[in-house]
Amino acid sequence: MGVIKKPDLTDPVLRAKLAKGMGHHYYGEPAWPNDLLYMFPVCILGTIACNVGLAVLEPSLIGEPANPFATPLEILPEWYFFPVFQILRVVPNKLLGVLLMASVPVGLITVPFIENVNKFQNPFRRPVATTIFLIGTVVAVWLGIGATLPIDTSLTLGLF
């Protein structure tokens, strides 16, 4: 562990270096344009080159071709649509299911207005937003797991 000395701003040599811009970045090389115009494109193009190289040299196999004449008994959407699929599958009225799905973003938009008196960044000092987030996460995971099960055990997840 090293000892860190607080800089003495009354030192005339240090003040002269700071006036020349030789403080934190001692070599005097500015971030603009060197880093932003030269280093970032190199990193971005290098990342793209690595991705293209992996895609060309090691392509992922798609699997067997689909048979249009043989469909599965139950077609499941992608995993990120499981909670929405479960809402539409469980609610008997489709209009009510669509309204339930539309109420989620509307409810999330109203959270800052409910808690506008609280200006803290710490989530433990914003109990309404934290509670809504935790309950929403649990409900979304519950619905997502239930969407993969048969309809008769989907709401209870086979636990009850």
Curated annotation (Swiss-Prot):
Gene3D superfamilies: plastocyanin oxidoreductase, Single helix bin
Membrane spanning stretches: 36-56, 95-115, 131-151
SUPFAM superfamilies according to UniProt: a domain/subunit of cytochrome bc1 complex (Ubiquinol-cytochrome c reductase)
Any GO molecular function: electron transporter, transferring electrons within cytochrome b6/f complex of photosystem II activity
Predominant location category: plastid
Cystine pairs: none
GO biological process, one term: photosynthetic electron transport chain
Compartments, record wording: Plastid, Chloroplast thylakoid membrane
InterPro entries associated with the record: Cyt_b/b6_C, Cyt_b/b6_C_sf, Cyt_b6/f_cplx_suIV, Cytochrome_b_C_euk/bac
Membrane topology qualifier: Multi-pass membrane protein
Pfam name, any one: Cytochrom_B_C
The entry's keywords: Chloroplast, Electron transport, Membrane, Photosynthesis, Plastid, Thylakoid, Transmembrane, Transmembrane helix, Transport
Annotated GO CC locations: chloroplast thylakoid membrane
Function text: Component of the cytochrome b6-f complex, which mediates electron transfer between photosystem II (PSII) and photosystem I (PSI), cyclic electron flow around PSI, and state transitions.
Family of the protein in this entry: Belongs to the cytochrome b family. PetD subfamily.
HAMAP family (alphabetical): Cytb6_f_subIV
Record note on quaternary structure: The 4 large subunits of the cytochrome b6-f complex are cytochrome b6, subunit IV (17 kDa polypeptide, petD), cytochrome f and the Rieske protein, while the 4 small subunits are petG, petL, petM and petN. The complex functions as a dimer.
Protein name: Cytochrome b6-f complex subunit 4
Organism for this UniProt entry: Staurastrum punctulatum
Organism phylogeny: Eukaryota, Viridiplantae, Streptophyta, Zygnematophyceae, Zygnematophycidae
